[in-house]
């Protein structure tokens, strides 16, 4: 089983190499530096699904909020 969490992109750290693209992502106020190499089209304000430090997809705000509610109900 793997756990991937939604977070909101709060800043991008530009890099000329898209494989090294990183950004700051907020998880309920906890800010982490995350690799955005798999989602190079991401923008500040977007929600991403993050697994082991890598954003693996972009999701809309509604889907992110639903996931956060589900996780809270499970006590995660």
Curated annotation (Swiss-Prot):
Domain of life: Bacteria
GO terms (BP aspect): protein maturation
UniProt-listed Gene3D superfamilies: 2.30.30.140
Pfam families in the cross-refs: HupF_HypC
Pathway per the UniProt entry: Protein modification; [NiFe] hydrogenase maturation
GO molecular function: carbon dioxide binding; iron ion binding
Protein family (similarity comment): Belongs to the HupF/HypC family.
Annotated function: Involved in the maturation of [NiFe] hydrogenases. Involved in the biosynthesis of the Fe(CN)(2)CO cofactor.
Protein name: Hydrogenase maturation factor HypC
Organism: Synechocystis sp. (strain ATCC 27184 / PCC 6803 / Kazusa)
